[in-house]
């Protein structure tokens, strides 16, 4: 098993994230595009690259629940336990927005989309970066999500200037066949089957 936390390319990617870069990296089921959620410049670059609207909101991933602490304030103990309980499949929780995240992450919605990633490389990126990352599928709007590094390169190789991808990590996607399940934390209602 690769020790991604000390991999030079993953370390380089984490440093680039701190400089408003947009990177591509593998997740549990598809390749993702990621950036610093606190940087409007980086988020706008990612959205231009993908051709996605700011109003849709974005998923954040983290290496552990502690990295999401600012966004979990105000949750009832039962809801917090549900969020902290490992799931059998990748699950993105829609958590009440306590106004800790910038509006460009929430898209102006009353929830935030948060997932603790099980993918070792993605988790290492979050650890090295020091917090959550934006995570959206690596594909232009309307195209299938990339499942290989080659597909990511095919989608974004022609991009130049402000639409250019800054870095492509090593690695492969995990074993999940479908994208993460999305469900409301408080009601348990499933928005997207995983």
Residue ranges and their predicted role:
Residues 1-194:
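Active-site-adjacent structural elements in enzyme catalytic cores
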């Amino acid at each position: 098993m690769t020790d991604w936390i000390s991999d030079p390319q993953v370390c380089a990617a984490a440093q680039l994230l701190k400089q408003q870069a947009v990177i591509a990296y593998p997740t549990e089921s598809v390749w993702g595009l990621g950036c610093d959620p606190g940087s409007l410049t980086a988020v706008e670059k990612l959205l231009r690259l993908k051709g996605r609207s700011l109003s849709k909101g974005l998923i954040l991933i983290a290496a552990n629940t502690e990295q999401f602490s600012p966004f979990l304030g105000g949750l009832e103990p039962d809801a917090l336990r549900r969020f902290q309980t490992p799931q059998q499949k990748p699950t993105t929780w829609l958590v009440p927005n306590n106004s800790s995240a910038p509006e460009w992450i929430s898209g102006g919605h009353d929830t935030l989309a948060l997932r603790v990633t099980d993918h070792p490389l993605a988790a290492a990126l979050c650890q090295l970066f020091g917090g959550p990352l934006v995570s959206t599928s690596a594909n232009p709007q309307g195209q299938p999500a990339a499942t290989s590094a080659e597909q990511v390169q095919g989608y974004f190789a022609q991009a130049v200037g402000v639409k250019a991808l800054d870095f492509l990590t090593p690695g492969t996607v995990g074993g999940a066949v479908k994208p993460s399940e999305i469900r409301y934390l408080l009601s348990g209602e499933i928005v997207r089957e995983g």
